[in-house]
UniProtKB/Swiss-Prot annotation:
UniProt-listed SUPFAM superfamilies: LuxS/MPP-like metallohydrolase
Keyword Iron-sulfur in annotation: no
EC number: 4.4.1.21
One of the GO BP terms on file: quorum sensing
The species this protein was found in: Proteus mirabilis (strain HI4320)
Required cofactor names: Fe cation
Disulphide bond pairs: none
Keywords: Autoinducer synthesis, Iron, Lyase, Metal-binding, Quorum sensing
Cofactor remark: Binds 1 Fe cation per subunit.
Name of this protein: S-ribosylhomocysteine lyase
Subunit structure of this chain's protein: Homodimer.
GO molecular function: iron ion binding; S-ribosylhomocysteine lyase activity
Matching Gene3D superfamilies: S-ribosylhomocysteinase (LuxS)
A Pfam entry, by short name: LuxS
Length: 171
């Protein structure tokens, strides 16, 4: 099985909260697609609670679009990582990491302004696969935690696993 890009970086050296350009690629028509790793918690130290990350998924996607779309950027998708330590954000364009960090911070401030669960988008049996698995309180705790820190930048060259380590780890 091919080694995915996300597994070529050393998760033991990642900081959080932090933005990382996980991948860039060109479409056949010449557009740039950038995938960002938005790392909320330090891997293998703390995972976001499942109800909180699910609620955050519903809120974060819209709030990030409000703060980041425009000036050559259009978000395609924001999805939680299976490890529950962050989100992947795919977009058209190449905003710098600080612009993404600023939008992320503004989105977390928006999460704190949500008054109750009735204001969570698509929170119903028709639009959500596990609509009863939500917690606004947990999502707001996650947002408060992010806002209590400076959002840093993780650099691939500083996190790259050496070739010998990759060979050692291959199954």
């Amino acid at each position: 099985m091919p080694l995915l890009d996300s597994f070529t970086v050393d998760h033991t050296r990642m900081s959080a909260p932090a933005v990382r350009v996980a991948k860039t690629m060109k479409t056949p028509s010449g557009d740039t697609i950038t995938v960002f790793d938005l790392r909320f918690t330090v891997p293998n130290k703390k995972a976001m609670p499942e109800k909180g990350i699910h609620t955050l998924e519903h809120l974060f996607a819209g709030f990030m679009r409000n703060h980041l779309n425009g000036e050559g950027v259009e978000i395609i998708d924001i999805s939680p990582m299976g490890c529950r330590t962050g989100f992947y954000m795919s977009l058209i364009g190449q905003p710098d990491e600080q612009r993404v960090a600023n939008a992320w911070k503004a989105a977390m401030e928006d999460v704190l302004k949500v008054k109750d669960q009735n204001h969570i988008p698509e929170l119903n049996v028709y639009q959500c696969g596990t609509y009863e698995m939500h917690s606004l309180a947990e999502a707001q705790d996650i947002a408060r935690d992010i806002l209590s820190h400076t959002i840093g930048i993780n650099h691939n060259d500083e996190l790259a696993l050496p070739e010998d380590k990759l060979k050692e780890l291959q199954i």
